Swiss-Prot record:
<dbReference type="InterPro" id="IPR036322">
    <property type="entry name" value="WD40_repeat_dom_sf"/>
</dbReference>
<comment type="similarity">
    <text>Belongs to the WD repeat DDB2/WDR76 family.</text>
</comment>
<keyword id="KW-0677">Repeat</keyword>
<dbReference type="GO" id="GO:0005737">
    <property type="term" value="C:cytoplasm"/>
</dbReference>
<feature type="repeat" description="WD 4">
    <location>
        <begin position="384"/>
        <end position="425"/>
    </location>
</feature>
<dbReference type="Pfam" id="PF00400">
    <property type="entry name" value="WD40"/>
</dbReference>
<feature type="repeat" description="WD 6">
    <location>
        <begin position="494"/>
        <end position="525"/>
    </location>
</feature>
<feature type="region of interest" description="Disordered">
    <location>
        <begin position="214"/>
        <end position="240"/>
    </location>
</feature>
<dbReference type="GO" id="GO:0000785">
    <property type="term" value="C:chromatin"/>
</dbReference>
<feature type="repeat" description="WD 1">
    <location>
        <begin position="182"/>
        <end position="223"/>
    </location>
</feature>
<keyword id="KW-0853">WD repeat</keyword>
<keyword id="KW-0227">DNA damage</keyword>
<feature type="compositionally biased region" description="Basic and acidic residues">
    <location>
        <begin position="83"/>
        <end position="102"/>
    </location>
</feature>
<dbReference type="InterPro" id="IPR050853">
    <property type="entry name" value="WD_repeat_DNA-damage-binding"/>
</dbReference>
<feature type="region of interest" description="Disordered">
    <location>
        <begin position="282"/>
        <end position="301"/>
    </location>
</feature>
<feature type="compositionally biased region" description="Polar residues">
    <location>
        <begin position="34"/>
        <end position="50"/>
    </location>
</feature>
<feature type="repeat" description="WD 5">
    <location>
        <begin position="448"/>
        <end position="491"/>
    </location>
</feature>
Length: 525
């Protein structure tokens, strides 16, 4: 049989195939020479012995959960604008609204620590109680407005000594501030435990969490790395031991520990309740709330008189002021006054004369009240001073001075001790000139939406004659001022990555804490 001669097309096709095979062979040889591909090594070689081949983990077939499928209303024979479809949509909307409302309704039950425990270390009852001009509205992170030059230029010896002392405070060295996340959400309120034996800090956040930090703890020695231990994992550097509880369902707006009752922490919340946390018995009990859980009366402030550990005072976002003796069983016996038509953002008692109350309101006023002469129908203040914008807080110190912060970017100081407040009779009235502030300090108070409002907080029992208070600084510091308006210190440090807006003093020790919007704290001692 005569073999047919190949066509020109077939010859060209075979030539292309041969050329392609030659190219692939050449590429394979080049790759092996450069080590991209290695020839299979025989069993028993040193390479196989040094790196034994691991058996692959058996694959487990993941069973998919059967979820209900969405079905078209058209296929089910329901018209788009039918009453059935509308009713179904309304019911779904109502259900979701009810779920959201249920999350925010306060819980009136008594709780143990286990009931409200969220995270951290579960502690026994005795574990905790073992014993100056800023440009308006412009924040420049880490730019100081007070420093060493201001201290050197101080002429008054006592003031200079105090400035040196306060500026010598340094950040807690055990952990950097960005490692101390005391609450899950933005911090709204803080306080120190009155004990001088060790610094214990309580912080409340936006969602009702309560964080507790015992700053007497030391970093474990295993956490200190050697130079050779470069491959140590993060687990070898543990975070500080913290406790997180959830006694409230909404923002914890204020808290206090009475010095004569150091085992009890009182917290007030936007969920309309005031609760008592017994640190010794590890329990939480509601002490005051409206009779119905459907009544929404958010509490904005909480205070107690120094000589009375049984009576609580509070203000609300509706402008009311209340007083309640916790020894009475009926909460309906609480006394309330409507002091403002708008929100009262903060208030405080004059501790040595607790019938005097200072309130700060959204209506731009700071008012001074005398409870001894306070009418329920037409309450009249001892006096009032109006600022250009909203007043955020009014804080009394132990000698009769009031410090306020306001959205007009000022801190105002009122000295009523020089006006004889301790000897005033019921019905005493101050005129407009007597209510003017004695000192005005420029301070940036433009916190915006994401930073907690700046509020001054006095050291209630200072160990020298010079009164002092602290307040957050939008440049990521905490400022300390004297009762006469002189700046004493500007506390900062490495690792502070947010504004320590909620600043508090220990009542007698020179310990200062600042809380941030990320739930972290800075501690200077």
């Amino acid at each position: 049989m005569v073999k047919e001669e190949l066509s020109e097309f077939e010859k060209q096709r075979l030539a292309n195939i041969a050329e392609r095979d030659a190219l692939l062979k050449k590429l394979s040889l080049d790759a092996q020479s450069t080590g991209v591909f290695t020839s299979n090594m025989p069993r028993g070689t040193s390479a196989n012995q040094s790196k034994p081949k691991k058996k692959p983990a058996p694959k487990v077939k993941k069973e998919e959960s059967l979820l209900p499928r969405r079905t078209s209303s058209r296929l089910r024979g329901i018209a788009a604008d039918s009453e059935i479809a509308k009713r179904k949509a309304d019911e779904e909307y109502d259900r979701r609204q009810e779920e959201e409302r249920a999350k925010r309704v306060r819980k009136s039950d008594s709780f143990s620590f286990n009931d409200i425990f969220v995270s951290g270390q579960k502690l026994s009852g005795d574990a905790l109680i073992g014993v100056d001009v800023v440009t308006k509205g412009v924040a420049v992170p880490y730019q100081r407005t007070f420093g060493e030059e201001d201290i050197k230029s101080t002429d008054d010896k006592d003031l200079k000594a105090l400035r040196k002392e306060m500026n010598s405070l340094s950040l807690w060295e055990a952990w950097e501030p960005n490692r101390i996340k005391i609450t899950p959400e933005r911090i709204y309120s803080m306080t120190f435990h009155p004990s001088e034996a060790k610094p214990v800090i309580f912080a409340g956040d936006k969602m009702g969490h309560l964080g507790i930090l015992d700053a007497s703890q030391e970093k474990p020695t295993s956490a200190v790395k050697n130079e050779d231990d470069e491959d140590d994992e993060d687990d070898d550097d543990p975070d500080p031991v913290l406790v997180t509880l959830k006694p409230h369902t909404r923002t914890i707006s204020s808290m206090t520990v009475h010095p004569s009752k150091p085992t009890h922490l009182y917290t007030a919340s936007y969920d309309s309740s005031i609760r008592e946390l017994d640190l010794e018995k590890t329990s939480s009990v509601e002490k005051y709330a409206p009779e119905s859980t459907s009544d929404d009366v958010p509490i904005s402030g909480l205070d107690m008189a120094a000589g009375d550990p049984n009576t609580i005072y509070w203000t609300t976002l509706d402008g009311a002021f209340g007083r309640y003796d916790m020894r009475t069983k009926r909460q309906s016996s609480a006394t309330t006054w409507q002091l403002s038509e708008k929100k009262i953002g903060g208030f405080s008692l004059y501790q040595t004369h607790p019938h005097y109350v200072a309130t700060a309101s959204l209506d731009r006023t700071m008012r001074l009240w005398d409870i001894r002469n306070l009418s329920h129908t037409d309450p009249t203040p001892v006096g009032e001073h109006q600022s250009r914008l909203s007043v955020s807080h009014a804080a009394f110190n132990c000698v009769g001075q009031i410090a306020t912060s306001s959205y007009d970017d000022t801190l105002k100081l009122y000295d009523f001790s020089s006006k004889g407040i301790s000897s005033w009779k019921p019905g005493h009235i101050l005129d407009e000139s007597e209510m003017k502030p004695d000192t005005i300090v420029r301070h940036n108070c433009q916190t915006g939406r994401w930073v907690t409002i700046l509020r001054p907080q006095w050291q209630l029992n200072p160990q020298s004659a010079i009164q002092r208070f602290c307040i957050g600084n939008m440049n990521r510091f905490v400022d300390i001022y004297s009762g006469s308006g002189d700046q004493l210190a500007q506390l900062g440090g490495d690792g502070i990555t947010a504004v320590p807006a909620v600043a508090v003093f220990h009542r007698s020790k020179n310990w200062v804490a600042g809380g941030t919007a990320s739930g972290k704290i800075c501690l200077w001692m």
